[in-house]
Amino acid sequence: PDETLHKLVFGGYNRKVEHPRTEFDWLTRDARIVDAYIAHPMCGFTETTGLLRDLMTGIRYIEKPESLAAMRKELPVFFIAGGDDPVGNYGKGVRQSADAFRKAGMADVSVHIYPLCRHEILNEINREEVYGDILQWLSSHMKKSSPST
């Protein structure tokens, strides 16, 4: 584990959180979830340099035009993110990814940015809304792909 690299990668994530209680408040506004994350022995560790290298390698791979070009164009894609998520650059990165998918010829790309939500939108205080939107999107796309009767 490399503490310096960890601080460089994750150190600024709480920067826009008003009055953070912990170093992990950027994850969600739900304090119970943050506390459970901190208490869990498999969470909150300092990652190895190799893990970060592999993560960056994967991100670079999926961002390549040839990787996007190889995707099945007829598959629908639903990007969801928190508007206060530092990992997704506060919604900007998610919108850029959606634009890249569209430019690659993906026919059905939807984006929903949840204002005030942080990184773990499925663990946010409005998680029911998020799950409801996912269910609605899935239902509408299942209807589109159902065989005609």
Give the ranges of each region predicted by the language model.
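Conserved alpha/beta-hydrolase "acid-adjacent" motif
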Residues: 86-96
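Short beta-strand/loop motif that positions the catalytic acidic residue
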Residues: 79-81
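Active-site nucleophile elbow and catalytic-triad environment of alpha/beta-hydrolase enzymes
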Residues: 43, 48-69
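Alpha/beta-hydrolase-fold enzymes
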Residues: 1-42
